[in-house]
Amino acid sequence: LNPKKKENNGVKNGDREKQHETGNTIFRGSPDKYLTEQGWMAQSDLGSRALVEDLVRYKLCQRSLVPEPSGAASCALHSAMRAAGDEFEERFRQAFSEISTQIHVTPGTAYARFAEVAGSLFQGGVNWGRIVAFFVFGAALCAESVNKEMSPLLPRIQDWMVTYLETNLRDWIQSNGGWNGFLTLYGDGAIEEARRQREGNWASLKTVLTGAVALGALMTVGALFASK
């Protein structure tokens, strides 16, 4: 007797697209796009991943590296992270641009670059401002990968960002109100209001971060990007 064929859930036999089941949810596509560790997926991971993917796409769109997405506008949390990232880049545009242009990344060195910068950025502790800097740096690394025709690195870099958030920063984020805590400080147009009042946004929102801290953390690892 021929063995009974298994239901393929609509995926053709010749299709290389794989299905990956986690709980009651089936994800279709490359496992790298959804999971960083087998069997590891929680609601908080999905929130962090969505936030990472939105900020990266937003920054790539700003650089005209990808087309503007169609559909609904981003949620309040995504809008707040976008505004915070823009404010960070605006305040430290020249120095940050110099750092970004020095990034020399290859598929073989990308993770080492990412890990060393992230480790240095949070060496002095964690706060929301440094988390914003982390997002901006990750997006810059993605942009550099696209510029160097290494677009396949994009899902990998985003995976690294999510993994770092959900392992190294998870406890701090949860103890500070989760992403709702971030939204309380940065949401509802808080950054735009601070800019209109000509206040230092990072100080007015009482993040621990200052320009010197954020920029200094990135500048201290500038040599990592300058290596040929």
From Swiss-Prot:
According to Swiss-Prot or TrEMBL, what is its membrane topology? Single-pass membrane protein
Q: Where in the cell is it found?
A: Membrane
Q: Where is this motif: BH2?
A: 171-186
What is any one of the record's Gene Ontology cellular component terms? mitochondrial outer membrane
Q: Which intervals of this chain are the motif BH1?
A: 120-139
Q: One Pfam family, please name it.
A: Bcl-2
Q: Where is the composition biased (Basic and acidic residues)?
A: 1-21
Q: Where is this region: Disordered?
A: 1-29
Q: Which GO terms describe its molecular function?
A: BH domain binding; channel activity
Q: What GO terms in the biological process aspect are recorded for it?
A: extrinsic apoptotic signaling pathway in absence of ligand; intrinsic apoptotic signaling pathway in response to DNA damage; positive regulation of apoptotic process; release of cytochrome c from mitochondria
Q: Briefly state the protein's biological role.
A: Could be the homolog of mammalian Bcl-W.
Q: Which family does it belong to?
A: Belongs to the Bcl-2 family.
Q: What is this protein called?
A: Apoptosis regulator R1
Species, as recorded: Xenopus laevis
